[in-house]
Amino acid sequence: STNRNNLIEIRSWTEIQEKKLNLTEDEEMFRVAVIQLHLEYWKKYENVLKEIKICDPACGSGAFLNQCFDYLHEEMNFVLEMKHLYAEGQLNLFDIDKQILQNNLFGVDINPESVEITKLSLWLKTAKKNQTLASLDDNIKCGNSIVADSNVAGEYAFNWKEEFPQVFANGGFDIIV
């Protein structure tokens, strides 16, 4: 948070200094190039955040997934603020909650009730008036995250590659909590 405030203070200080000076054309081109570099950085970081895959293989009530959600949500909001700050344009808002729930967070638990509690806890965190809740059926699943053999685990046998094909098509999970 302190680093974020420092970035904003640096930006404000830079603007004040630029007003004091009568920038030459070369200096203005340099300033624009620096702003473009900052924008490029924030866009790349945004893409990293959008693509990261986090899994809790024993999600229980969803406590760890909720913490991961909070972290990603805070980071995405900050990235959008920084992009807006450097672009000096309109803030580009999209549904961060839905993005995180459907693309970033995944969980498995052997207890069906725990799976439903995890979904409920994430829905309670992200529910908005007059908006449909994000579907979590493809991301939060019931199964034995250790045993894939149905002869051993019965109906709870869990094959990761079959259950999360889109994740494993791109190399698997980035973070396991």
Question: Each predicted region: which residue ranges?
Answer:
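SAM-dependent methyltransferase catalytic region
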Residues: 1-177
